[in-house]
């Protein structure tokens, strides 16, 4: 098991926690000043502080993804669908939470608002070429493999 250094930036910030021993995601909690709550209007986005900053291992990034129950039951999900925390970023982690529902949603201090999944990535350089290798699929686009 690897260790990730986390700095608590706000009073009341909570460390990420897995929901089960085999869960891939670690719950991220809203850290609102003074136990406040935040109302997110229908079809609007709010920036929620977590009160955390990370030193993620080199060669990884943090993927901020939706919590399945929050998205399916309340219509709340990360606005960018998948947020990226780069391993060299040291600022506070915020969750841009979007309300897809037609009703106001309330987020309270300590609510679980997203999950953090640590993933590896492959550093690469792009090489411009005049031709690409042929494949069976070729240039078949949207829906071309579905029947």
What are these regions (language model features)?
Residues 1-147:
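DUTPase catalytic domain/fold
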